[in-house]
């Protein structure tokens, strides 16, 4: 199912959506933060999807617990370190970990740039102990408005040498991409690549805007592109990568069932598309789960899954020499 001669990558993976249950428990107790349960076992349903839950509101509540326990910069560093460990232990050869420093900082009023530094330090420490290649993507969380995104951008750009790209995430309907055109001009001027959450809650116009105005060369989720034949043609022609997260899309009610997921439609249209976990801590999944789902629920053959693996490497924010090195390590 997973082809061991091809690098296994996860390109759409939120660091702040992957906090271990026991880490939430330990940090909560360490910092005197009231948790919604009185044991580790009973905490899990409050912070992870259980069974067939499919509600965006429930999903976001669980996600909020992951940052509620980030009471100091050591906690941030720990979570970043554990993200590297989790990526390696799940069998990944390469992962791009994205994070929103504003979202991580806000509960306990941590310094935004300090959060960025703590994430970088935690990842560096993790890379000393685990065999996996990691790059970082900064997120601007549009839900908090333009001014907050400016603060976030400045904290991230102060350490741009440790980032490969910038992302726009959050409330796509309430805060459309055009509000952030100036922010992304600064990102382009800084020489960083751009990906954007688009076409998830909003329609295809949001994706056109992200590509044509923000400068995105990859799109997170993008499920609504399938209703716009011109966009599908454009995506295929220009190799705009779709970072697909099927289980997360089900958990957030972006799609009502795996049968409704447009992954196959993208593949049949020749669009570059990869499989990713999104918020693996909340969804309680790993990358291998997504490949199993792609085979059993989305109907992909082993040959198609191998192509999806290759797509991920092609889409990655890597130099050609880094791409070749990933393949060489699998030979």
From Swiss-Prot:
Keyword Zinc: yes
Catalysis performed (reactions): adenosine + H2O + H(+) = inosine + NH4(+); 2'-deoxyadenosine + H2O + H(+) = 2'-deoxyinosine + NH4(+)
Domain of life (superkingdom): Bacteria
Enzyme Commission number(s): 3.5.4.4
Cofactor details (free text): Binds 1 zinc ion per subunit.
Active-site residues, as the UniProt record annotates them: 200 (proton donor)
Binding site for Zn(2+): 12, 14, 197, 278
Cofactor dependence: Zn(2+)
Keywords per UniProt: Hydrolase, Metal-binding, Nucleotide metabolism, Zinc
PROSITE patterns in alphabetical order: A_DEAMINASE
Record site feature (Important for catalytic activity), residues: 221
Broadest EC class assigned to this enzyme: hydrolase
Pfam families named among the record's database cross-references: A_deaminase
GO cellular component: cytosol
Family statement: Belongs to the metallo-dependent hydrolases superfamily. Adenosine and AMP deaminases family. Adenosine deaminase subfamily.
Function, in words: Catalyzes the hydrolytic deamination of adenosine and 2-deoxyadenosine.
The name this protein goes by in its record: Adenosine deaminase
Taxonomic lineage from the root: Bacteria, Pseudomonadati, Pseudomonadota, Gammaproteobacteria, Alteromonadales
Gene: add
């Amino acid at each position: 199912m997973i082809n061991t001669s091809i690098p296994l990558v996860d390109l759409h993976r939120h660091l702040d959506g992957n906090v271990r249950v026991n880490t939430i428990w330990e940090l909560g107790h360490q910092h005197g933060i009231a948790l919604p349960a009185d044991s580790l076992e009973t905490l899990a349903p409050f912070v992870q999807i259980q069974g067939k839950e499919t509600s965006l509101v429930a999903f976001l509540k669980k996600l909020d617990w992951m940052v509620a326990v980030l009471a100091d910069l050591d906690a941030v560093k720990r979570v970043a370190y554990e993200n590297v460990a989790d990526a390696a232990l799940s069998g990944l050869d390469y992962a791009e970990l994205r994070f929103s420093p504003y979202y991580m900082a806000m509960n306990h009023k941590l310094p935004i740039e300090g959060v960025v530094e703590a994430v970088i330090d935690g990842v560096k420490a993790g890379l000393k102990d685990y065999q996996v290649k990691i790059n970082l993507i900064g997120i601007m969380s549009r839900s908090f408005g333009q001014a907050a995104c400016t603060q976030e951008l400045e904290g991230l750009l102060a350490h741009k040498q440790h980032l490969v790209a910038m992302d726009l995430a959050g409330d796509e309907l309430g805060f459309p991409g055009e509000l952030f055109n100036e922010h992304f001009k600064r990102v382009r001027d800084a020489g960083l690549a751009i990906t954007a959450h688009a076409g998830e809650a909003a329609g295809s116009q949001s994706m056109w805007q992200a590509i044509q105005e923000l400068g995105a060369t990859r799109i997170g989720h993008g499920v609504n592109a399938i209703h716009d034949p011109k966009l599908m043609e454009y995506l295929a022609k220009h190799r705009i990568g779709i970072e697909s997260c099927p289980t997360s899309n089900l958990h957030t009610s972006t799609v009502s069932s795996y049968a409704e997921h447009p992954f196959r439609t993208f593949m049949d249209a020749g669009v570059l598309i990869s499989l990713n976990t999104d918020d693996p801590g909340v969804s309680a999944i790993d990358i291998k789960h997504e490949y199993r789902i792609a085979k059993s629920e989305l109907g992909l053959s082993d040959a198609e899954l191998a192509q999806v693996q290759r797509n991920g490497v092609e889409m990655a924010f890597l130099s050609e020499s880094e791409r070749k090195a990933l393949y060489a390590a699998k030979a």
